[in-house]
Curated annotation (Swiss-Prot):
InterPro entries membership: Kinase-like_dom_sf, Prot_kinase_dom, Protein_kinase_ATP_BS, Ser/Thr_kinase_AS
Listed EC numbers: 2.7.11.-
TM annotation in the entry: 294-314
Record organism: Arabidopsis thaliana
GO molecular function annotations of the record: ATP binding; protein serine kinase activity; protein serine/threonine kinase activity
Cytoplasmic topology ranges: 315-657
Segments on the Extracellular side according to the record's topology features: 24-293
Coiled coil: none
Listed name of the protein: Wall-associated receptor kinase-like 20
Topological relation to the membrane, as annotated: Single-pass type I membrane protein
A Gene Ontology cellular-component term: membrane
Domain named Protein kinase: residues: 363-646
Length: 657
């Protein structure tokens, strides 16, 4: 023993010396790091106007998602339906551009020049939106516009504008004012179909100041848009990234299948304003950017603590097994307390390991009915004849164990006809088990896409709508009625079970999260958490900023709606490379005005005119759910209400016939 002590006494200072030498060498190397390279090429000026990155006027500069046009020394912004507007100013710091509204079609009419295109409509899939700094004047309106938040009263600003600047509109029946300040960003200013035939817009009009008196000039008209900060440049190989950003790698973009982007090397991070790999200021890659003294001090502490732990482990090796058993007992006790504390007391109970082992025939593979990344599901028959489904974490999978325990916390607090019912829990085996009601008719995924072991009768359009409505109701209950609110976080067609009457039951709450409103900023319902879910269904905003909200579930449900309309999988590698992701595929078909080609042929074969109308309506609802900006997506309650409205259209048609 004395020899061992002498050995450690010599070993510790030797290791410290070697470690410090290596640390000093490493820090010296880091001190000689090259400065970051310039970013992607900025487009040349267009006449007198500077074109900042990421705006792009050509295929070799800027970011192609931010296309604008340079024609005759002027910049133009292209909207949908072939409309185009002059850009009067650009602010690269605030990422905003101001457009010139079209004005009236003639000097004697009160009709907008773009009335044939029904006003300004932006492509919601592009990174531009209308800001909240605009005051919109709606001219030549019908009585249908007399509702809040539109102001059509005699004191409305638009009447003052008509007197000064738009005399052709003085004989029009109504004019109204709409302030976008404080509202959500939008993509549309509608005229014609919305009850008005003309519009004008002003940026930053102060409502607390009087408008110009008669005879005085109003400020110039303008409509302000904002662009979202750009992602890293698109690439094909590392060579592209070296040319654009220096030492960066070309890696797959997790939010866009088939697309690759440059990823800055460690110690640097993407600066979307200056379009460079700049000095790292936050995030996990910044941890190496420490001063030499701090690094060396940390090294000393780490080595010392590590050696101390090593000596302690040698001395306590023989007591390890006893400690492990004690920990297991404590975990079992914690599970029991958690179940009894959260249970509604109606039907949830604790099952014994002996009961479950017998019911599953010792977890025979013959009873295995499902498996996933974290767990397995077995069919089981209890002693009273009740058929159940039993979920078990995989052996040595701590994430699976955590998810099953999380599922207990969630399901013990909810009760809804469209949510799978938890019968109880088993806590005295090595792995925790959940016992559910057995749902016999497979999953929505299997009914839409088929399964290897069973043939399913195709779902009718009316049945698909009922399943969509029931699922939306269940999710709306989690978001709104449950206290605290619950976000599912893994909504997909394979997690929607169908009973013997083809009614929907939402299942698999392993990734779900309870929302503690007391811990979220300003009492808003969002959670910061590592992105988890299923590829093809994952909300891109959640993936980018780790902010989980109820709208993350809405996005995932939008993908499910697309599956119902098309009978195509969310991710399918048998499709062309650019079409692997269903959302991207549908967006492409919409741009090409070929959306009807995507509808499930079995639906089209039997659909009448009303069916096709409601199929289109559900497709539009799916598109709203999939809006890239979460604030523009409907709530799950609104989704359920819209599906109910669509179902009522079909019901009225049946009644009339």
């Amino acid at each position: 023993m004395e020899k061992k002590r002498s050995y450690y006494a010599l070993l510790i200072p030797t290791l410290l010396t070697v470690w410090l030498a290596c640390a000093g060498h490493s820090c010296a190397r880091h001190a000689k790091a090259k400065p970051p390279m310039a970013g992607p090429p900025r487009c040349p000026n267009c006449g007198p106007m500077v074109v900042p990155y990421p705006l792009s006027t050509g295929p070799t500069c800027g970011d192609q998602a931010y296309r604008i046009n340079c024609v005759g020394g002027k910049l133009y912004f292209g909207a949908l339906h072939g409309s185009s507007y002059v850009i009067t100013s650009i602010n690269s710091v605030t990422q905003r551009i101001v457009l010139r509204p079209p004005g009236l079609a003639s000097s004697v009419s009160c009709i907008s020049a773009d009335v044939s295109k029904q006003g300004l409509e932006l492509d919601p899939h592009l990174p531009f939106s209308i800001t909240s700094s605009n005051t919109i004047l709606l001219l030549n309106c019908s009585q249908a516009m007399l509702q809040a938040p539109i102001d059509c009263s005699p004191t409305s600003l638009c009447y003052s504008y008509i007197k000064n600047n738009a005399s052709p509109c003085s004989k029009a029946p109504l004019c109204c004012t709409f302030r976008t300040d404080g509202s959500q960003t939008a993509y549309t200013i509608r005229i014609n179909g919305g009850g008005c035939l003309a519009y004008q817009s002003f940026v930053g009009l102060n409502p607390n100041k009087e408008v110009p008196p008669p005879g005085k000039k109003w400020p110039d008209t303008g409509l302000e848009l904002q662009w979202a900060l750009p992602k890293e440049p698109v690439c094909k190989t590392d060579v592209d990234c070296n040319l654009l950003l220096g030492k960066s790698k070309c890696l797959p973009d997790p939010t866009s299948l088939g697309l690759k982007r440059c990823s800055c090397k460690k110690g640097l991070e993407w600066d979307p304003v200056n379009a460079i790999c700049g000095k790292c200021r936050h995030g996990k890659h910044c941890k190496k950017k420490k001063k030499t003294v701090v690094f060396a001090g940390a090294a000393v502490a780490v080595v010392g603590v590590t050696l101390a732990i090593a000596v302690a482990v040698i001395g306590t090796k023989h007591s390890h097994q006893k400690v492990k058993k004690d920990i297991h007992k404590n975990i079992v006790k914690e599970r029991e307390e958690m179940l009894s504390a959260n249970s509604t007391g109606k039907s949830s109970r604790i099952f014994t390991g002996r009961e479950i082992t017998k019911a599953t025939n010792n977890f025979s593979k013959d009873n295995l009915i499902g498996t996933g990344g974290f767990g397995e599901v077995f069919k089981a028959v209890l002693e009273d004849g009740t058929i159940t489904a039993i979920k078990r974490a995989k052996l040595n999978n701590t994430k699976g164990t955590d998810q099953i325990l999380n599922e207990v916390r969630i399901l013990c607090q909810v009760n809804h006809r469209s949510l799978v019912r938890l019968l109880g829990c088993c806590v005295d085996l090595e792995l925790p088990l959940l016992i559910y009601e057995f749902i016999p008719n497979g999953t929505l995924f299997e009914h839409l896409h088929g399964s290897s072991d069973r043939t399913w009768k195709p779902l009718t359009w009316r049945r698909r709508l009922q399943i969509a409505y029931q699922t939306a109701e269940g999710l709306a209950y989690l978001h709104s009625a449950a206290q605290p609110p619950i976000y599912h976080r893994d909504v997909k067609s394979s997690n929607i079970l169908l009973d013997e009457k083809l009614n929907a039951k939402v299942s698999d709450f392993g990734l779900s999260r309870l929302v503690d409103l007391t811990e979220t900023a300003n009492n808003e319902s969002h959670i910061f958490t590592g992105a988890q879910g299923t590829l093809g269904y994952l909300d891109p905003e959640y993936y980018r900023n780790f902010q989980l909200t109820d709208k993350s579930d809405v996005y995932s449900f939008g993908v499910v709606l697309l599956e119902m309309v098309t009978s195509k999988k969310a991710i399918d590698f048998t499709r062309e490379e650019e079409d692997v992701n269903l959302v991207m595929y549908i967006n492409k078909m919409m741009d090409q005005e070929r959306l009807t080609e995507c509808i499930d042929p079995l639906l089209k074969k039997t659909a009448n005119k009303i069916d096709m109308q409601t199929i289109q309506q559900l497709g539009n609802l799916a598109s709203a759910c999939l809006n890239e900006r979460r604030q523009n997506r409907p709530s799950m309650k609104e989704v359920a209400d819209e599906i109910e409205y669509i179902i009522n259209i079909l019901s009225q048609e049946v009644t009339e016939t």
